[in-house]
């Protein structure tokens, strides 16, 4: 990965990325979804060029093609690419999603329950999206609490699409919680116990806390 500097990508880097996606598509066949996250790194012409080059490989979505500060930039990309667009992890509260939904700037939205205002706000955003027939796929960059909070909300959302996790295996979260998350055939099992249904491993968290960045545990 890299930071946003001027929104460009080198010719070699671009070709490498396209080659990787081509190889993935060939390996998994036509029926497996391939989702691309641009992480808001690109300017408008670069995002358009990349999306068009990736289109032949039938990607499910091109996520955050441009930085989130400009809906106008997002619209330019939206109007000039055939790939489906996903945005939302860096949008905060339901009000930020209004122009995205009203102007049809995305095919999918990806609000983050911990960044956008909590469980109630995620539910409101999802209900708004339902009125526009836009699927919701909650973002995860914070761990098992984030995953489980998003899962609980999605149990009540007809337009739920997929639940993201930042880990290739949910078992990577096991050390942080007293009981592991259970995933069967790709489906996260939501506990029936009170609250979110998980308990944090407080002793583990205390052992690895960084004093400069943490309060009482």
Region locations from a protein language model:
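Metal-dependent enolase-superfamily TIM-barrel catalytic cores that perform enediolate-based chemistry
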Residues: 1-75, 80
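Structural signal for hydrophobic packing residues in well-ordered secondary-structure cores
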Residues: 25-28, 58, 154-158, 209-212
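Shared catalytic-loop signature of beta/alpha-barrel
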Residues: 52, 58, 67-187, 191
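C-terminal extensions of enzymes
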Residues: 177-217
């Amino acid at each position: 990965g890299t930071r946003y500097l001027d929104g460009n990508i080198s010719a070699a880097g671009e070709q490498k990325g396209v080659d990787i996606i081509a190889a993935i598509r060939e390996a998994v066949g036509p029926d497996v979804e391939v989702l691309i996250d641009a992480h808001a790194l690109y300017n408008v012409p670069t995002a358009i060029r990349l999306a068009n080059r990736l289109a032949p490989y039938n990607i499910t979505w091109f996520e955050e093609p441009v930085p989130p500060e400009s809906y106008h930039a997002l619209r330019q990309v939206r109007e000039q690419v055939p790939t489906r667009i996903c945005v939302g992890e860096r949008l905060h509260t339901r009000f930020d999603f209004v122009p995205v939904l009203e102007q049809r700037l995305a095919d999918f939205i990806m609000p983050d329950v911990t960044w956008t205002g909590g469980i109630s706000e995620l539910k409101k955003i999802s209900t708004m999206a339902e009125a526009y027939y836009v699927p919701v796929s909650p973002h995860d960059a914070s761990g098992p609490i984030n995953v489980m909070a998003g899962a609980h909300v999605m149990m009540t959302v007809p337009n739920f699409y997929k639940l993201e996790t930042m880990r290739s295996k949910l078992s990577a979260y096991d050390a942080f919680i007293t009981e592991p998350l259970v995933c069967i055939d790709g489906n996260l099992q939501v506990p029936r116990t009170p609250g979110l249904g998980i308990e944090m491993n407080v002793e583990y968290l205390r052992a690895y806390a960084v004093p400069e960045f943490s309060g009482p545990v």
